[in-house]
Amino acid sequence: SVLLGGIHFASTWLGKVQEAFSAGTLGYLFLLLALFGILIALLDSSGAVTEFAAWLSRYANSRKKTLFITYILGLSIFVDDYLNNMAISTAMKKVSDSHKIPRTMLGYVVNGTGATDCVIIPISTWAVFYAGLFKQFGVTVNGSGTQAYFAAIPYMFYPWITLIVLILVILGVIPKMGVIKKHDKIAMETGVVCTTDVSLDGVEIQAPDFESIIGENSKARPWNFLVPLVVLVGVTILADINVMAGCMAGIAVTAVLMLAQRKIKLAEIFDNAYQGVLSMVMICAIITMALTLVQINTATGMPDFVVSILKPILHGALLPAIVFAFCAVYSFFGGGFWDMAMIFMPIVVPLANALGVDPLLPCAALVCASVAGSNTYVCGDAVMITSRALDIKPYYQMMGTLPYAVISYLLSIVCFVVVGFLNL
């Protein structure tokens, strides 16, 4: 803002905030997050989450099984990364706590299966967005952006590698590193899965004794949690990947189920709705600042500056690798994943055509860069949503993921270099 407006930086900054609001993304995110907050509050206060956790703990009876079940659930909810991160975090955190799995480790597994499977399973909000973007910039197969997107999926190396790395971490083939290693040691020695420094609310989270919960809830059933979740996913798909419609349907079904079983009173539904919306205020404020930063980066010419650096070293075979490497870093520091793709797509496609490179490759690299940013950007919506659901600070969520994301990042660059030379 200072670079753009000088001494009038305050009014410049406010103008960029207004631009962020007028873009439409914020309004959508605010309403969607409010609906998620209501749904989570209803499921939590009615005991549906606790019952599901108690039921699931019979099968998730070890640390590895718990993380593997989290991984499978993450793959099964592929229609939207917001839905994935929020639902899986809410469902698994109590079971995870009972096995002294640090919240940062759970967050890594949850967020690692968020946008990653959304891009490689083409029935998702991400696939719909990028297929439209491909067509808009002339990247088609048989005149179809959707078919072009399908054709690009095998070249989306970052999400494929990330899912493999996740499995290897869960199995212990790849060791715990950095923040996760530190927090795992604390959890195993003290039973504290989230310290006051890490907790979003500054409250120490202790691992519960799930044996007693199962004993008290021997008839615990998963349906009060699973039925709203299935309705949410089903309506989302039937409504042309409209997560908002799915979320509203999930809220309605949850309310009916809980009222019918007398688990909650009508007045409590409205109280929980208010508390659910209130719980999302902080994340909405942070996302507003993040999208404002995207507007400022665009206005200051950051994308053009990046391109000016890339031009002297561009080579046709290296284009996909360079696009991924630089755009992933841009997403990590500058924020904006879909926004980043919209900024760089009109630059990347003409460059690919001019250098004689199949535009599917750099376009796949752009998708990968978006996913890398989504997994790691500290103020990004994916990290923020997961952090809120798991009650941990976004910084620790990012730092827990970062070492493994770097592994996927470096291996993806190697894959893009190899494929770039093979397809030139």
Q: Where are each of the predicted segments found?
A:
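C-terminal transmembrane helix pair
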Residues: 99, 140-141, 156, 284, ...
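Alpha-helical transmembrane segments of multi-pass membrane proteins
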Residues: 63-77, 101-127, 142-161, 180-183, ...
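Juxtamembrane and boundary regions of transmembrane helices in multi-pass small-molecule transporters
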Residues: 117-207, 368-424
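Alpha-helical transmembrane segments of multipass membrane proteins
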Residues: 38, 75, 167, 233-237, ...
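Juxtamembrane inter-helical linkers in multi-pass membrane proteins
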Residues: 58, 62, 90-107, 182-210
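Hydrophobic transmembrane alpha-helices of multi-pass small-molecule transporters
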Residues: 1-32, 155-159, 170-171, 187-292, ...
